[in-house]
Amino acid sequence: MEETKAKNTTWLCVTAMFMALNIVLSSFGVPVPGGRLYLNDIIICTAAIILDPTAAFIVGGIGAFIGDFLFYPAPMFVSLVTHGLQAVVISYAAHHTFKKHPLFASILGVSLGAIIMVAGYTLGRAYIYGTPEYAILKLPYQILQATIGAVTSILLCCKFTLPKIFQQILKQ
């Protein structure tokens, strides 16, 4: 019983840490035409590679929702759905496909996640702002944001073996 409680506490703390990082990176962005470029995709993709799909949704979806709620509330529901789905797909691909080739599974996951993020935000912006032109204006920057998040998370996970480190932490 105590072992299960300790594992649940560790899982909760690791998930909360990644969610806090997501919220912090949602608080500022690089100015670009039509808005800002945010770096929280790095945390969303990295956490999704490391954590299970439930924790990935909490970090990606709920973390982005809270970040938007605090700093820029207009797209907060788009962020909840888009980043939540993005994180779940990345996590599922990283943990349940190509088990003998985890790097390939992670690359597949972040690639699918990038597509989900770009499509979700493009459709969401067109709906929220009532103009597809605004969504198209932001499209190249959404692609750049998704690419930066995907590539950086793969590099972080490969170079520093973050999945192995966090799996050891979560097993204790």
Placement of each model-derived feature along the sequence:
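Loop-helix junctions at membrane interfaces
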Residues: 1-172
